[in-house]
Amino acid sequence: MIFANHAHVFPEDIKPSGTIDNLKRLMDDCGIDKAVCFAPFSDRFEECGRTDTPNEWLAKAIKNEPDLYGFGTVDFTKNLRDEVDRIADFGFKGIKMHPPYQEFDIDGEDAFKVYERAEELGLFITFHCGMHWHRLKGVRPILYDEVGWFFPKLRFSLEHLGGYHFFNESLAVMCNNSRGEVRPRVFAGWTSVSDCEGIDAWTLTNEQLETIISQTGDESSMFGLDFPFHGAEYIKYEMERFNSLNISDTAKENILGETLRKVLGV
């Protein structure tokens, strides 16, 4: 079974290429069985004048989609504990957080409120990890070590694992949080790391991908789509690339779905 993380989905009036139907077509084309869908960030709904919330929309959109699992979004202008509670009430498995885009500090007081409640409720968090055209001071990957330190039962993924610029820093966070009662709890998100379109901000080499496995083990990595920002050819290339790496068959199975399945309990 192939189970992919990291699909950004949208109502058609906000981003036509990012609809649930288009995601399902891509999954069929690529042979992907299940996927995690992220609710859009709240500013996208506000810009379009929608009266529903992103989490309300996503809950309705995937209600009858047994192969799609929801991750909610947090609106930092609202009561954060209530925001996380509503995400759990919708039956979502986790939260998508993007420090540069949402403009919050990884180790900030507001963010810690989200982590605390997510830990209490057993929600997984998928973080953007790496540069994204925002001041780096509050969003450097090393700050995720603070999340691991203060919330030892919280499970989360570092998507792109820092990318081209912050790979070693992100890997250090994973390795530094590899002990404790909950293991593994910091995961590498193998998302948008391809070299098929040249070297960009999130590209990782085969050697770096193999290093993730050798340093953190077979059960700490998971594959992500970054839909709709990549199409079927890109996704197929990545899946073939991962299967060609000099790592165990067990590691490959885990990357392409088994780790995510276990983490989310589905």
What spans do the regions from the language model cover?
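Active-site beta-loop-alpha junctions enriched in small/polar residues
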Residues: A7-F10, P40-S42, T73-T77, H98-Q102, ...
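Active-site gating/metal-coordination segments in enzymes
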Residues: K34, G49-V139, F187
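Acidic/histidine-rich helix-loop elements
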Residues: V9-G18, D43-E47, E197
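Short, acidic/polar
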Residues: K15-M27, T77-I87, D110, T205-Q208
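Mid-to-C-terminal alpha-helical segments outside catalytic/metal-binding sites
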Residues: M1-A7, P16-K34, D85, G217-S220, ...
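Divalent metal-coordination and catalytic microenvironments
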Residues: H6, M27, A35, L58, ...
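Alpha-helical elements of Rossmann-like donor-binding domains used by nucleotide-donor carbohydrate transfer enzymes
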Residues: N22, W57, D82, R86, ...
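Catalytic pocket-lining loop regions of alpha/beta-barrel enzymes
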Residues: K93-G94, D107-M222
